[in-house]
From Swiss-Prot:
Taxonomic source organism: Aeromonas salmonicida (strain A449)
Name of the protein this chain belongs to: Phosphoglucosamine mutase
Keywords from the named record: Isomerase, Magnesium, Metal-binding, Phosphoprotein
The record's account of how the chain is modified after translation: Activated by phosphorylation.
Binding annotation for Mg(2+): 101, 240, 242, 244
Role description: Catalyzes the conversion of glucosamine-6-phosphate to glucosamine-1-phosphate.
Catalytic center residues: 101
Catalytic reaction list: alpha-D-glucosamine 1-phosphate = D-glucosamine 6-phosphate
Cited PANTHER family: PHOSPHOGLUCOMUTASE (ALPHA-D-GLUCOSE-1,6-BISPHOSPHATE-DEPENDENT), PHOSPHOHEXOSE MUTASE
Record-level Gene Ontology MF annotations: magnesium ion binding; phosphoglucosamine mutase activity; phosphomannomutase activity
Modified residues annotated as Phosphoserine in this record: 101
Length: 444
């Protein structure tokens, strides 16, 4: 059954435009409350990032949940993975995050976690969607839910993050830059690393409601790289607006993406006997990651793009490490979802145990040049079914001879075909991508 409101990561859009309006979000809170109230504790946690619209949407959700008879526990600015963790520890029915992740301040979204800290099952999302088709019907006055604010949520999550780093190790002597993207980790991440012994230079920690992800954070890592070089730091780490993804920078200013972070974490787990199974990446994962893991004898599998699909495949295979090149890293031995701070701590653990700088740890993986070309096509057409396109793809794959990949996929949000080619030689890859793109254009 097709979804009307929920995407792969909740409900998202531009603030003030449907569905991110106060009236719809209030109804969403009520609908979620109706579905969740059939269970036990009738408590729901609400966290948000630092967007100015978060105040408005938090109040709307609170009103809707109260009308359905549920208690709203407000945590204020809190990373997405913190909401997932605290939902479990509070024994709540669900956790709700108000965030649009790495998007600009004028976007926002609502996403849900179930009682065990994982994404809501499809059947629960569909039940909420079904309730949205009904008029709001408030419970009796005596049954209305209350709202309370907890003041120690950040401290609880800081202690959890620190607990994922071995107690016999210390970050003493390490100088690092931490860029919080003016987002939800601003009052948490610097404290985690400082309390573990690191010297921390913090940037992107002055949110004003409008500057989230604005020239800082994991989607703008040049600011981090520049600060690492300026301060002669050992490394840097940057988070996105809601703290579920990261990128890192070594002491030379080289930007380390999610694929390289996966490699570092997996190799360290193998070296220390903690690796269970293999690693899950996505269709967009660099082939350099696959070959580097292959050299170590570590199995690698590709899921569809999206952390939801990565997690699904990890659970299917029983593997504990997975993620995306965008920096969503899932370490199931520690968390139930992507967690930027926890993933950074796994890399820092590898630095400590191997007694190597970050630049040395990532040197075992060489990324292949990867070229992406977007081709717009007319609605109703299917260029991917054209014989000429498939013949050109087959020809390119033959030329790559197993030392590269071709991926064609439709955008999920606009009429675009994304042509991705990767291989060992950049100019060759560019030429191949253009050849395929021309055939796609000719197909309609």
């Amino acid at each position: 059954m097709a979804r009307k409101y929920f995407g792969t990561d909740g409900v998202r859009g531009k603030v003030g435009e449907f569905p991110i309006t106060p009236d719809f979000v209030m109804k969403l809170g009520w609908a979620a409350g109706k579905v969740l109230s059939k269970k036990g504790t009738k408590k729901v946690l609400i966290g948000k990032d630092t967007r100015i619209s978060g105040y408005m949407l938090e109040s709307a959700l609170e009103a809707g949940l109260s009308a359905a008879g549920l208690k709203a526990i407000l945590m204020g600015p809190m990373p997405t993975p913190a909401v997932a963790y605290l939902t479990r520890t509070f024994r709540a029915e669900a956790g709700i995050v108000i965030s649009a992740s790495h998007n600009p301040f004028y976007d926002n979204g609502i996403k849900f976690f179930s009682a065990d800290g994982t994404k809501l099952p499809d059947d629960v999302e569909m039940a909420i969607e079904a309730e949205l088709d009904h008029e709001i019907k408030c419970v009796e006055s005596a049954d209305l839910g209350k709202a309370v604010r907890i003041e120690d949520a950040a401290g609880r999550y800081i202690e959890f993050c620190k607990s994922t780093f071995p107690s016999n190790l210390s970050l003493e002597g390490l100088k690092m830059v931490v860029d919080c993207g003016n987002g939800a980790t601003y009052h948490i991440a610097p404290s985690v690393f400082r309390e573990l012994g690191a010297e921390v230079i913090a940037i992107g920690c002055s949110p004003d409601g409008l500057n989230i992800n604005d020239g800082v954070g994991s989607t703008a890592p040049d600011a981090l790289a520049a600060k690492v070089l300026e301060c002669k730091a050992d490394l840097g780490v940057a988070f996105d607006g809601d703290g579920d993804r990261l990128v890192m920078v070594d002491h030379t200013g080289y930007i380390i993406d999610g694929d390289e972070i996966l490699y570092i974490i997996a190799r360290d787990a193998l070296r220390n006997g903690r690796l269970k199974g293999g690693v899950v990446g996505t269709l967009m994962a660099n082939m350099g990651l696959e070959l580097a893991l292959q050299t170590l004898g570590i199995p690698f599998a590709r899921a569809k793009v999206g952390d939801r699909y990565v997690l699904e495949m990890m659970n299917e295979k029983g593997w504990r490490i997975g993620g995306e090149n965008s920096g969503h890293i899932i370490c199931l031995d520690q968390t139930t979802t992507g967690d930027g701070i926890v993933a950074a701590l796994q890399v820092l653990m590898a630095i400590c145990t191997a007694e190597m700088p970050l630049a040395k740890l990532r040197s075992g993986m060489s990324k292949f040049p990867q070229v992406l070309v977007n081709v717009r096509f007319a609605e109703g057409k299917d260029p991917l079914a054209a014989d000429a396109v498939n013949q050109e793809v087959a020809k390119v794959e033959q030329e790559l001879a197993g030392r590269g990949r071709v991926l064609l996929r439709k955008s999920g949000t606009e009429p675009l075909i994304r042509v991705m080619v990767e291989g060992e030689h950049e100019q060759q890859v560019r030429d191949m991508a253009q050849r395929i793109a021309q055939q796609v254009e000719s197909a309609f």
